[in-house]
Structures are given as C-alpha cells and as structure tokens.
C-alpha cells in the first residue's frame, strides 16, 4: 500500500524517488541524489554469478534534507537483488 508503479529501472518505486532514498533487498536504506537515478544502471551492476554477500551497491549521500512520509509505512525492497 502506498507504493507507486515501478519506473522500469530495477523496480525503483515513486516513493524512493520522492523521499530520496532506496530500500535495498537486505532492508538497508540508502540515501540517493538525482544523479544516482540518471547514471546508475541497476541491471549492468548486478551480476548473476556474484556472491550476494560480497555484492555491494554504491552508497550515494545527498546533502538535501529528506521528507519522510507522515505516519505511513513507506516502501520495501525496491532494489533489484
């Protein structure tokens, strides 16, 4: 509930973009900036034979303040695993 449709880039929902964060498959929340969505190719950076314990996504930190949803559960597992 509350999750908008996928943008087609690795399943990133509208809430990820709106609140400037990404919830990864392991539950970690990563702060994003607008360049992350334009420059990062989720499909290219996920290898099928890579061990999931060693596979890491880039951590991008944005200095702009984030607005959080008021009283609602935001979203879950938008990053492609």
UniProtKB/Swiss-Prot annotation:
PTM annotation: Myristoylation and palmitoylation (probably on one or more of the nearby cysteines at the N-terminus) enable membrane-binding and Golgi apparatus-specific targeting and are essential for efficient packaging. Phosphorylated. Phosphorylation does not seem to be required for recycling to the host Golgi apparatus. Packaging is selective for underphosphorylated forms.
Membrane topology annotation: Lipid-anchor
Main location: virion
Motif range (Di-leucine-like internalization motif): 22-23
Pfam families on file: UL11
Assigned keywords, A-Z: Host cell membrane, Host Golgi apparatus, Host membrane, Lipoprotein, Membrane, Myristate, Palmitate, Phosphoprotein, Virion, Virion tegument
GO biological process: anatomical structure morphogenesis; viral budding from Golgi membrane
Coiled-coil parts of chain: none
Residue span of region Asp/Glu-rich (acidic): 41-47
Domain of life: Viruses
Region Disordered, annotated ranges: 47-81
InterPro entries linked to this entry: Tegument_UL11_Herpesvir
Quaternary data: Interacts with cytoplasmic envelopment protein 2; this interaction is essential for the proper localization of each protein to the assembly complex and thus for the production of infectious virus.
Family listed: Belongs to the herpesviridae cytoplasmic envelopment protein 3 family.
HAMAP family recorded: HSV_CEP3_alphahv
Function: Plays an important role in the cytoplasmic envelopment of tegument proteins and capsids during the assembly and egress processes. Also participates in viral entry at the fusion step probably by regulating the core fusion machinery.
Protein name as it appears in the record: Cytoplasmic envelopment protein 3
Annotated organism of origin: Varicella-zoster virus (strain Dumas) (HHV-3)
